[in-house]
UniProtKB/Swiss-Prot annotation:
In vivo, elicits a series of symptoms, such as being sedative, tail stiffening and twisted jumping, when injected intracranially into mice. Residues 21-47 form a propeptide. Transmembrane segments: none annotated. Negative results: does not target potassium and sodium channels of locust DUM neurons. Disulfide bonds join 55-68, 56-61, 57-65. GO terms for molecular function: ion channel inhibitor activity; toxin activity. The cysteine framework is II (CCC-C-C-C). GO terms for cellular component: extracellular region. It comes from Conus vexillum. It comes from the Eukaryota. Residues 1-20 form the signal peptide. It is found in: Secreted. This is Conotoxin Vx2. Expressed by the venom duct.
Amino acid sequence: MMSKLGVLVTICLLLFPLTALPLDGDQPADHPAKRTQDHNLASPISAWIDPSHYCCCGGGCTDDCVNC
């Protein structure tokens, strides 16, 4: 009887290992710094945009803008 139980437990552990269970440290609420790290998505996107294709008409014009 005990050997059957051991075989059953071994099969269950092989099919569903304990590492598949989520741990408390894996919850996103425990890592607020990782969530707020990527809050500024405009900086990588602005590197792809060529400012010479746009014109600035107003007080917020910078040196990299083209006048209208």
